[in-house]
Regions:
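Conserved catalytic-core segment of nucleotide-activated headgroup transferases in glycan assembly
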Residues: 56-120
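A charged, aromatic-enriched C-terminal amphipathic alpha-helix characteristic of glycosyltransferases
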Residues: 171-198
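Membrane-proximal helix-turn-helix segments that form the acceptor-binding/catalytic region
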Residues: 2-27, 128
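Short, well-ordered alpha-helix to beta-strand connector turns
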Residues: 23-26, 69, 111, 130, ...
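Donor nucleotide-sugar binding/catalytic pocket of nucleotide-sugar-dependent glycosyltransferases
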Residues: 22-63
Length: 198
């Protein structure tokens, strides 16, 4: 699967997924980028009913704890499609910045400390210990909730145009706007489904 690349107009999933999309009553996209990446391969979906509903992230779980912050953090950026090459380049360019990578990864620069796993209940505190959250994927990401979590936790986000969360205008309007967007996402999802099935 190569979203938004010419070779994906005929890639193997397209033949399986096209009828599923076409038969659906409603498509729920996690961001405008999520929708655009699929319309690239399935332009006929332009006319299909859809709703934009971001991933549910609880602002009660992610907030600024006013801790001392230092360096950068990334989650799963050691995975190729999540942007390992770009992440490593960023770390090399910022060799004096200590970087914490949560998740898999190998052959990392010396300024990167890797942690295999952080409990969900400890993620907010982990974000709060860092100034910057780095996420530079190579494929369009439907949303990437870690971006929203880190942003709500007070991190400055270093992203790129392939991060679905950042395609929401609220991310350029400030944390309060993002908080309002996300705290209603679970309800919006169920409201959209109820409208379709009723």
């Amino acid at each position: 699967y190569y979203p938004m690349e010419e070779r994906c107009r005929t890639c193997y999933p397209s033949q399986d997924w096209r009828p599923i999309f076409q038969k659906s009553k409603l498509i729920i996209w996690l961001s405008t980028l999520h929708r655009e990446s699929w319309l690239f391969s399935f332009s006929e979906l332009t006319r299909h009913d859809y709703a934009l509903v971001p991933s549910p992230v609880s602002p009660d779980d992610f907030y600024d704890m006013k801790l001392e912050r230092k360096g950068a953090i990334a989650v799963d950026s050691g995975i190729d499609f999540k942007g390992k090459e770009r992440f490593v380049e960023w770390c090399v360019e910022h060799k004096d910045t200590p970087v914490t990578l949560v998740g898999p990864g190998d052959n990392l620069p010396p300024n990167v400390t890797r942690i295999e796993h952080v409990l969900y209940t400890k993620l907010n505190e982990m974000y709060n210990k860092h100034e910057v959250f780095v996420h530079l994927p190579v494929n369009p990401m439907p949303f990437d909730r870690t971006v929203a979590e880190a942003y709500l936790a007070g991190c400055h986000v270093i992203g790129n145009p392939l991060v679905g969360a950042l395609s929401w205008p609220e991310f350029s309007q400030g944390r309060e706007a993002v908080k309002v967007l996300l705290e209603g996402s679970s309800n919006k999802f169920w409201e959209e489904l109820e409208e379709v099935v009723s």
